[in-house]
From Swiss-Prot:
Subunit (UniProt): Tetramer of two alpha and two beta subunits.
Cellular compartment(s): Cytoplasm
Cofactor descriptive note: Binds 2 magnesium ions per tetramer.
One cellular component (GO) term of this entry: cytoplasm
UniProt-recorded name of the protein: Phenylalanine--tRNA ligase alpha subunit
Keywords, in A-Z order: Aminoacyl-tRNA synthetase, ATP-binding, Cytoplasm, Ligase, Magnesium, Metal-binding, Nucleotide-binding, Protein biosynthesis
InterPro entries linked: aa-tRNA-synth_II (IPR006195), aa-tRNA-synth_II/BPL/LPL (IPR045864), Phe-tRNA-synth_IIc_asu (IPR004529), Phe-tRNA_ligase_II_N (IPR004188), Phe_tRNA_ligase_alpha1_bac (IPR022911), Phenylalanyl-tRNA_Synthase (IPR002319), tRNA-bd_arm (IPR010978)
Primary location recorded for the protein, binned into one broad class: cytoplasm
SUPFAM superfamilies found in the cross-reference section: Class II aaRS and biotin synthetases, tRNA-binding arm
Protein encoded by which gene: pheS
């Protein structure tokens, strides 16, 4: 029996030395120390030996079992250490490698031009006002001198939510809302940046776009004040070299009304494809506040006057940055946005 135990010991040690993975080690453990393993069967067979031989063989067999268990633990620890070293080696960081620069965020060009416009008018004493994008028909049309049967309603295709609610087609409703809150106090000097909605969608129109509305109410306000304000605005946005002109126009909420043009920023007024070879670019509409609108707002047109203007922010941005397709603003193309 002692010789058999020695043979099993030598054989197990030889096989264990050849084990090269955790899978092989687990297989070795089952074959030697498992329920039907060699050492387990050896220990079970001791019961058939005589007393003295059983004691000697039992001591040697138990030593073999303990030695094998110790060798298994050491082997397991060695494999775990090797596995850890391999993992650390794979995750090794070369601190001498150059760092990857972080990409910095940028303001959208429409955000940039909106803030620039706001800063210009705030510098002239204006404050920023806001209003709802889902607007009452009353404020969007009627209070701006556009009654239900007025032909000017045909000029704008609107997104109606119900008979009395729609997505505002311009930021002008905030004019009346502000006058209602302020009346009869004067002066009022506000600009209203915001989103507006119309049923247009092509290279120069979008169903959602941005406007900046302006309103000034006070005593003895004249068209000269309007011209001076907007000329200063044009020079600050497009440069002191641009020339400004006004053309008669029509808006229900202003009287008289005008369109303001600037000399073409692409050809400096010489005539090109952008300005249709006229040398001029339309940038906004303006006029003196219609007396009926003043009355809707709670003011006496015999006591106060005012002017208003409105411009498309996309239009200003396209002219300033030389962009020929409005849709580029809404496509979120990083190649386009990274230029600003």
């Amino acid at each position: 029996m002692l010789r058999k135990i020695e043979e099993i010991k030598n054989e197990c040690q030889a096989r264990l030395s050849q084990v090269s993975s955790m899978e092989e080690l687990n297989e070795f453990r089952i074959k030697t120390l498992g329920r039907k393993g060699e050492v387990t069967l050896l220990l079970r067979g001791l019961k058939d030996l005589s007393g003295e031989e059983k004691a000697r063989a039992g001591r040697v067999a138990n030593e073999l079992k303990q030695n094998l268990e110790q060798m298994l633990r050491e082997k397991i620890d060695a494999f775990k250490l090797d596995e850890l070293e391999q993992k650390l080696l794979q995750e090794k960081i070369d601190v001498t490698l150059p760092g990857l620069p972080r990409q910095r965020g940028r303001q959208h060009p429409l955000t940039q031009i909106t803030r620039e416009i706001q800063d210009i008018f705030i510098g002239m004493g204006f404050t920023v006002a806001e209003g709802p994008e889902i607007e009452l028909d009353y404020y969007n049309f009627e209070a701006l001198n556009v009654p239900r049967d007025h032909p000017a309603r045909d000029m704008q295709d609107s997104f109606y939510i119900s008979e009395e609610l729609l997505l505002r087609t311009h930021t002008s409703p905030v004019q009346v809302r502000t006058m209602e809150k302020m009346a009869p106090q004067i002066p009022i000097k506000i600009i209203v940046p915001g989103k507006v909605y119309r049923k247009d969608d092509d290279a120069t129109h979008s169903p959602m776009f941005h406007q900046v509305e302006g309103l000034v109410i006070g005593q003895r306000i004249t068209f000269a004040h309007l011209k001076g304000t907007l000329v200063r605005f044009a020079h600050q946005v497009f440069g002191e070299d641009v020339t400004v002109r006004y053309r008669p126009s029509f808006f229900p909420f202003t009287e008289p009304s005008a369109e303001m043009d600037i000399s073409c920023v692409m050809c400096q007024g010489e005539g090109c494809r952008v300005c249709s070879h006229t040398g001029w670019l339309e940038i906004l509409g303006a006029g003196m506040v219609n007396p009926r609108v003043l009355q809707y707002g709670g003011y006496d047109p015999e006591e106060v006057t005012g002017f208003a203007f409105g411009m498309g922010i996309e239009r200003i941005a396209m002219l300033k940055y030389g962009i020929n397709d409005l849709r580029l603003f809404f496509e979120n193309d990083k190649r386009f946005l990274a230029q600003f």
